[in-house]
A protein has these predicted regions:
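Short beta->alpha connector loops
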Residues: 266-272, 293-295, 331-334, 428-431
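Aromatic- and carboxylate-lined catalytic core of secreted/periplasmic carbohydrate-active enzymes
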Residues: 18, 323-327, 335-461, 470-491
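Active-site mouth of glycoside hydrolases
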Residues: 4-285
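Catalytic-core region of carbohydrate-active enzymes that cleave or remodel glycosidic bonds
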Residues: 278-367
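A generic structural motif
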Residues: 26, 461-462
Length: 491
């Protein structure tokens, strides 16, 4: 549940005074099998070692998984030479007849229990390790932002792939209202089945869909890259996503289930990129994952293009105001990027940082973990360890009483409960002092190196009146540093 005391954070139902801070790495195949190199499906679907994945997260101090739903049984990644031929899917493959992959067609009125068994097992296994899981009901990205023709022809709801006479031709037939009543009824049955399968697990959050369409027009060059002719009309999924949220809420209430936090994430494309997050903020969802909304991209372009400036969400995120819990996911503003400073900046601005971790596409135990390259396992290690470090600080502090207070430090990064606790980031690594405006009192001080991850205990500081107090990072700590101040004798 969202804390009434500080709506930037969740709390557990019986303890509204303890914030639940979420952070972790995620990747496309953490639920399904079938992702690997090359455009064609493998004869035997590739498997992620889920137990090793949980070990990998736990070792780095992570406590959150974005559990991916990929709806195509045959597809490829945009711009990447690898396939996503994902199995199991929620519906039984009974035939008669063969689907596009030459395996039996789907019966969309019969569930594949192996999918739901795996779904429950993975959420439960994460819970046993103290991790929360956001379960994604649907995926939009694969239906309109992955290469043609398999973006649609590799989906169970394509006419060639099922025995039920259902035939979608684009994302507009699947995630944009009004829908064919038969399609919507099948979606409703599936959503209810997912909720029935997982409702009693305490570590559960929901997500409607990853990057569904938002009513904007595709750039023709981008559409051509995907193999889609002309300017595709993808429609606006907003009303449909609100319908899914309402459906989940109604079903939980009707069945007497515990209510789990609902999330809505960035849509693409949208008519005005600077307003990309407006439907999320206006939604009935408790948590959101925003997308890039920088003015520099108002006329087109995006932060993933070569030579493009980076989004503020990566480099200088806005402070969370508590309108929604913000799970800040690099997937929506900086896929393929993320470092230690990103994690710390996001945390000190009141967000929950999670990493779209391309470094584990090949698994969490690569043959050479130290091998270099921008998408290598090693490239993302600083971000991974930093996420765990932010969590350790979050759980030491009374985070529920703290808020982003950029005005209290000359660095622009402070999370504070004035007069009690302050956590300050000096991001530049420049030699020399910075200031923190403190309330009167005595404070214990502790320094932490963002890159080296080592601590230095500082001398106690006493201030007689509210004033900007100067602090100089210890010479032993090179690079960006964190200063933790806690009132002496505080409860």
């Amino acid at each position: 549940m969202v804390s009434e005391a500080n709506r930037r954070y969740f709390t557990v139902a019986d303890d509204d005074r303890t914030a639940v801070y979420l952070t972790g790495s995620h990747i496309w195949n953490n639920l399904h099998d079938g992702m690997g190199p090359g455009g064609g499906c493998a004869e035997a679907p590739e498997e992620l070692d889920y137990g090793a994945y949980l070990d990998f997260l736990a070792e780095r101090g992570h406590n959150f998984i974005r559990l991916w739903r990929w709806e195509q049984f045959k597809s490829q990644a945009a711009g990447g030479d690898f396939h996503l031929c994902m199995t199991p899917q929620p519906w039984a493959r009974t035939g008669p007849g063969a689907a596009k992959d030459q395996k039996p067609k789907f019966d969309l009125e019969r569930f594949e229990e192996a999918f739901f068994d795996r779904l429950r097992a993975r959420v439960a296994a994460a819970g046993e390790r103290g991790m929360y899981v956001a379960v994604m009901f649907f995926d939009g990205f694969g239906l309109h932002l992955s290469p043609a023709p398999d973006h649609v022809e590799g989906h169970p709801f394509h006419a060639a792939n099922n025995v039920n006479g259902i035939g979608i031709g684009s994302i507009a037939d699947y995630q944009v209202l009004p829908l064919d009543p038969r399609v919507q009824a099948l979606q409703e049955a599936y959503v209810r089945k997912v909720v029935d399968t997982l409702h009693d697990l305490p570590n559960l959050l929901w997500e409607v869909a990853n990057e569904s369409s938002g009513g904007g027009t595709a750039d023709p060059a981008f559409a051509e890259m995907l193999g889609q002719a002309g300017t595709p009309e993808w429609g606006d999924s907003t009303a449909w996503q609100y319908w899914v949220i309402d459906l989940v809420r109604r079903h939980e209430a009707e069945m007497g289930y515990d209510r789990h936090p609902m999330g809505m994430t960035m849509q693409f494309p949208v008519p005005d990129q600077t307003k990309v997050n407006a439907p999320l903020l206006a939604s009935p969802a408790e948590w959101i994952s925003p997308g890039y909304d920088d003015e520099i991209f108002a006329g087109g372009g995006h932060p993933m293009a070569p030579g493009s400036p980076q989004s503020r969400w990566l480099e200088d995120p806005p402070a969370a105001d508590g309108a929604k819990v913000v799970i800040s996911d690099t997937d929506h503003y900086a896929p393929g990027r993320g470092d230690a400073l990103w994690a710390w900046k996001s945390f000190l601005r009141g967000h929950h940082p999670i990493l779209m971790d391309f470094g584990i596409i090949g698994g969490v135990n690569p043959p050479d973990p130290a091998a270099g390259g921008p998408m290598s396992f090693a490239a993302f290690e600083p971000a991974r360890w930093a996420m765990g470090d932010t969590r350790r600080f979050a759980e030491r502090m009374r985070l529920i009483e703290m808020a982003p207070r950029n005005d209290l430090s000359s660095t622009g990064y402070a999370l504070a409960n004035p007069g009690q606790e302050y956590l300050v980031l000096e991001p530049s690594g420049a030699a020399g002092p910075f200031t923190v405006t403190l309330e009167p009192g005595g404070y214990a001080t502790e320094w932490f190196s963002v890159e080296g991850r080592n601590r230095v205990q500082g001398e106690a500081t006493t201030v007689d009146r509210a004033a900007a107090t100067s602090f100089d990072p210890p010479a032993a700590l090179a690079g960006p540093t964190v200063l933790y101040l806690k009132r002496i004798g505080d409860r």
